[in-house]
């Protein structure tokens, strides 16, 4: 879909120089001499490389049309992840590397968002919040309750995270996956 460069927004995906680029940030600039332009910070979806591009504000850019579908995680075999569409029961396989560091969060029956461009899978995402059990943590140190303090913990999948002092071994917690941070304790 062709648009003016003035309409670029962070989060959009553009077709540019033969690749797909996710817009990270933009800055409109009106110099004292010459025409206005847009400075865009972009990330190549295939390679992950950051890229800076300057567009004239009246230039035409092409926004990529992406399809996003939710699949259910079945199992991992080597470097291959098997997923199933919840309504059609169609099974697909994706490369484990598409999930990056987030592959440690995979759990049975987890919903995985798969993004495609022209019927080719370009990315996959785990949910923003995942429930995990605390496998190992330090005991509470008395007198450290004046300010919000955190202690290290190891979760069932081996990830290390800082948790509040009241969390004990065996507690279930919700983890915020985009930044690997504690979100809340599961209420039972």
Curated annotation (Swiss-Prot):
Signal peptide: none annotated. GO terms for cellular component: cytoplasm. GO terms for biological process: peptide biosynthetic process. Gene3D superfamilies: 2.30.30.30, Nucleic acid-binding proteins. Keywords: Cytoplasm, Elongation factor, Protein biosynthesis. One of its GO terms (molecular function) is translation elongation factor activity. Its main location: cytoplasm. It comes from the Bacteria. Pathway: Protein biosynthesis; polypeptide chain elongation. It is found in: Cytoplasm. Involved in peptide bond synthesis. Stimulates efficient translation and peptide-bond synthesis on native or reconstituted 70S ribosomes in vitro. Probably functions indirectly by altering the affinity of the ribosome for aminoacyl-tRNA, thus increasing their reactivity as acceptors for peptidyl transferase. PANTHER family: ELONGATION FACTOR P, TRANSLATION ELONGATION FACTOR KOW-LIKE DOMAIN-CONTAINING PROTEIN. Belongs to the elongation factor P family. This is Elongation factor P.
